[in-house]
Regions:
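N-terminal loops that bind phosphate or other acidic moieties
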Residues: 2-133, 137-380
């Protein structure tokens, strides 16, 4: 009996990792009916991460009333894994762009609901929180999340307030003395796949602000306010966070979770591999089948395919990447431990056209892959 580990990322804009896992499983079992299949849909911290972790690890989804990014009450959620002490939270579930319903306001959106979800998960028994950054509507260092967890933000008169992106310039002092004691002893791991600093031309405001509705003047104000926040953090908390890799993720939420929650930032794929116990699954495996929508030079920077290849390389287990688009620089993946790259593109067409047949093209590529596997197996 052969053993296959299926660990695809989503094909952005076409198929989720859950869908791809299912298609891989169906194709594999058609050609290798007695195969042992380990399906692990990959989460990257953005939308769909809770469902992916629950599918891989078991557990259940918990619905929680919380504050949305525009301060209206919404129904948020998190996933409590089967171990009973690990919770997965998507920042986007309480502070995501879609929740703004087209009314983008980078200077006025809040992450308060994210803090409420963290508290709810801890009260539910979680001692380890996996927080996914991605799809955020906010741009102010996650101060609202911290405020929901008891961190106090004070203006020049000593009055407490909950900052947003447009009011960070009023901030004079940060008081951590009332931070919720429920956080004590809780490990918070933040999934972060970008290395942007907090401020400057590569910072949160300049790179991500426009997609949240910020025009050039607003980008300048937001960047100035985030720099001010970093100075107050340095003054009151003794932390230098402005230039840390990932500080600018999700509108500066990366900086906020490090400064206010003591969280560590970790590449999303490393979080997934550690949580599912990937290294322990490898012994006896025939191959690992992974994939993503596009493989290029950016894929070498800790993305899903390369993260898996690095782990599997130690055991010399083949890693096959099924991808939508093979771009220049993809061949460097072979030096990182990828055994083969299989493209689903059967004809040269623009992405807008290719996405319409993405499912059929993936199925065709998988059909060829497993036919080839059976041919080699029969020839031995």
């Amino acid at each position: 009996m052969s053993k296959w580990i299926l660990m695809p990322d989503s094909f952005k804009g076409t198929m989720s990792s859950l869908e791809i896992c299912q298609l891989m499983r169906e194709a594999l079992l058609r050609h290798v009916p007695d195969a042992e299949v380990v399906s692990i849909p990959v989460a990257d911290g953005g939308e769909g991460s809770v469902e992916a972790f629950l599918a891989a690890m078991g557990g259940h989804r918990v619905e929680v009333p919380c504050t949305g990014p525009d301060f209206r009450k919404i129904s948020g959620f998190y996933g409590l894994l089967a171990d009973g002490y690990t919770a997965v939270i998507e920042m986007a579930a309480a502070a995501g762009l879609p929740l703004m319903e087209g009314r983008l306001c980078a200077e006025g959106a809040t992450t308060y609901g994210v803090g409420e979800l963290i508290l709810a998960a801890i009260r539910d028994g979680a001692r380890r929180i996996i927080l996914g950054l991605g799809g955020s509507a906010t741009n102010y260092g996650g101060c609202g999340c911290a405020a929901a967890l008891g961190v106090r933000f004070l203006d020049g008169t000593g009055a407490e307030y909950v900052p947003v992106g447009g009011t960070l310039d009023r901030l004079c002092r940060i008081d951590m003395s009332h931070r919720s004691p429920l956080l004590n002893g809780v490990e918070i791991v933040t999934m972060c796949d970008v290395d942007n600093p907090l401020c400057g031309p590569n910072g949160a405001s300049a790179v991500f602000g426009p997609q949240k509705g910020a025009d050039p003047d607003m980008v300048t104000r937001l960047d100035r306010n985030l720099r001010h926040l970093s100075e107050v953090i340095r003054q009151d908390l003794g932390r230098e966070i402005a230039d840390l890799p990932g500080a600018g993720a999700a509108g500066g939420m990366g900086a906020g979770v490090m400064a206010f929650l003591g969280s560590r930032l970790q590449m999303g794929i490393e979080t997934v591999l550690d949580t599912v116990g990937f290294d322990a699954l490898l012994p006896g495996a025939t191959a690992v089948l992974t994939g993503e929508g596009r493989i290029d030079c950016q894929s070498l920077r800790g993305k899903v395919v390369i993260g898996i290849a690095h782990r599997a390389r130690q055991t010399r287990i083949p890693v096959v990447a099924v991808v939508g688009d093979v771009a220049p620089g993809a061949e460097d993946a072979y030096q990182e431990g990828v055994t083969a790259i299989v493209s689903t593109n059967r004809r040269a067409v623009p992405w807008e056209v290719a996405r319409q047949s993405a499912r059929a093209d993936l199925c065709a590529a998988l059909e060829d892959l497993f036919r080839l596997y059976n041919a080699f197996r029969s020839a031995r």
